[in-house]
Amino acid sequence: MTNKTWGGRFKKSLDSSVNQFNASLSFDHVLFDQDINGSQVHVKQLAKQKILTEAECQEIYSALEEIRTEIKQGQYSFNERDEEDIHMFIEQLLIQKIGDLGKKLHTGRSRNDQVALDLRLYTRDKGCLINELLTRLIDCLDDLTSKHQQDLMPGYTHLQQAQPVTLGAYFNAYQCMFSRDKSRLEDWFKRMNYSPLGAGALAGSTLPLDREWVAESLGFAGIIPNTLDAVSDRDFVIELCSVAAMIMMHLSRLCEDLILWSTQEFNFVTLDDAFATGSSLMPNKKNPDVPELIRGKSGRVYGHLMAILTVMKGLPLAYNKDMQEDKEGLFDTINTIIVCLQMITPFLQSLTFNTPLMRTKAQSGYLDATAILESLVMKGMPFRDAHHQVGAWIAEAIEKQCSLNELLKGG
């Protein structure tokens, strides 16, 4: 018999290398707050259903709160423990504090529904924070839209000057993109906010559990009715990672423009000293590290999305140990998108835009060609003929080194 909580049927101790390979405490300890919240509601339910006494419930509840405080105060080193994961870590601390009563905590529960609950609570908490940060970014873009609604600049396709737009319209485009991202995040929240607790390992429990009461107590919209589904899917993790990848894609595109605009060749934007870095060799340099890092970090978020999709694609129902691999990528995705959103808003607010140069560029370079084409169409000329005619005028203007308006007025 081993000293593991699940070791009753085993005659040999777990090989130390397997124990180390199997462990996830070094990274899943970030779930401690959610794990304790879930356990506290679970024991209150056990008392409500007369499976535990009120006195037992209160003693377990209070001891769990003490453990939460001790973890927050840094009293434990997660890298020096033998427990497999944060769930076993907290349970063992509980048993050390209150003895055999602590062994009743896991009554009516499996780690399968326990970890599914913890992940839903964790992603819900972090999803709310991401939503708040998105709102701040959208508000910032709205301010920039209003501030620059009259400031002309060149619009680009293929990174070539195309038609005049306003700087305000540019920022409004990203405001629209991030608003859709916010909508996606809120849609995800509606789908994921259901409780798996009470699903057990895969087939529920013979104990008279009240799953609906637990769900309501933890702020869920309801329960996941199918217990197999409750413990076996991580689509809510995948969907959050997908939304995060979309947000990072939009952030990366925004940053790409700002990086280009900050070059001497464009000179559309000046970086604030507080949000730029220098070179260890070249004293003339002022580098856009903030947007470059955000652009670069998009790759790791994409990678984590592909990783969890690949982990899940071939798993039979219900739970499999493969699913432990959902966490590190999820945690890094969340941490990455939070820090990027925290940086981008003050970075945008710090920028100085060279609007006179933008206007000059918008009024040169034949950006008025499409408007002239359409004026010919309005006079009755077929579109293709008008397109050909304006193209010929542009070729002539380039040869004469004058603007299109100057050419037409001279003609």
Swiss-Prot record:
It comes from the Bacteria. It catalyses: 2-(N(omega)-L-arginino)succinate = fumarate + L-arginine. Its EC number is 4.3.2.1. GO terms for biological process: arginine biosynthetic process via ornithine; L-arginine biosynthetic process. Transmembrane segments: none annotated. InterPro entries: Arg_succ_lyase_C (IPR029419), Argininosuccinate_lyase (IPR009049), Fumarase/histidase_N (IPR024083), Fumarate_lyase_CS (IPR020557), Fumarate_lyase_fam (IPR000362), Fumarate_lyase_N (IPR022761), L-Aspartase-like (IPR008948). The keyword Lyase applies. SUPFAM superfamilies: L-aspartase-like. Pfam families: ASL_C2, Lyase_1. It is an enzyme of class 4 (lyase). Keywords: Amino-acid biosynthesis, Arginine biosynthesis, Cytoplasm, Lyase. Pathway: Amino-acid biosynthesis; L-arginine biosynthesis; L-arginine from L-ornithine and carbamoyl phosphate: step 3/3. One of its GO terms (molecular function) is argininosuccinate lyase activity. Its main location: cytoplasm. Belongs to the lyase 1 family. Argininosuccinate lyase subfamily. This is Argininosuccinate lyase. It comes from Legionella pneumophila subsp. pneumophila (strain Philadelphia 1 / ATCC 33152 / DSM 7513). The lineage of its organism: Bacteria, Pseudomonadati, Pseudomonadota, Gammaproteobacteria, Legionellales. The gene is argH.
